[in-house]
Regions:
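Helical-face signature of the major facilitator-like transporter fold
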Residues: 20-28, 60, 94, 102-106, ...
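Helix-breaking motifs and short loop linkers at transmembrane-helix boundaries and internal kinks
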Residues: 46, 78, 99-105, 116, ...
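Cytoplasmic helix-loop-helix junction between adjacent transmembrane helices
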Residues: 109-141
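Conserved MFS/SLC helix-loop-helix module at the cytosolic interface between two early adjacent transmembrane helices
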Residues: 65-104
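Small-residue-rich segments within alpha-helical transmembrane domains of MFS-like 12-TM solute carriers
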Residues: 28, 32, 98, 114-122
Length: 144
């Protein structure tokens, strides 16, 4: 007995591009929240400018190092699975950040957040390469 053929979704690549755009937008918005909240966080937690800078650096270091790690992982496990792991990771860490009660825990959560969010760029780039024909790849990347 044969299985019924699934009907292809018209322009599926553009739906995937939209999901990648949303993920990237969430990443960029999330990165900016710390800057917007800095005056309030510094006051509530009694952080100095140096403390705040160290927290921002923790995110950036993890983000920079994580892209290489995620790139290799995504190549190994596949784009869909790799991006799902990354999005799940940074979503959970975003929620857990609310449990931070001081400098050390906040810096640790921001480090973990940077590590999770760093999956987005290698994963989104690979997804565009997989789903978009060569003639549309750059417009696909422009939306990511």
């Amino acid at each position: 007995m044969s299985r019924p053929q699934a009907r292809p979704i018209p322009a599926l690549r553009w739906w995937i591009g939209g999901v990648l755009f949303a993920s990237t937008a969430i990443n960029y918005i999330d990165r900016q929240t710390l800057s917007i909240l800095a005056p309030y966080l510094k006051q509530d937690y009694h952080w100095t400018n140096a403390d705040y800078a160290d927290i921002a650096i923790a995110f950036r270091v993890a983000y920079s190092l994580g892209q290489t790690v995620w790139g290799r992982l995504i190549d190994r496990v596949g784009t869909r699975r790799g991006l799902t792991i990354g999005v799940t990771w940074y979503s959970i860490v975003s929620v857990l950040t609310s449990l931070a009660n001081g400098f050390t825990s906040f810096a640790a959560f921001r480090f973990l957040l940077g590590a999770g969010e760093s999956a987005n760029w290698p994963g989104a780039s690979k997804a565009v390469s997989e789903w978009f024909p060569k003639r549309e790849r750059e417009i696909g990347r422009a939306h990511v």
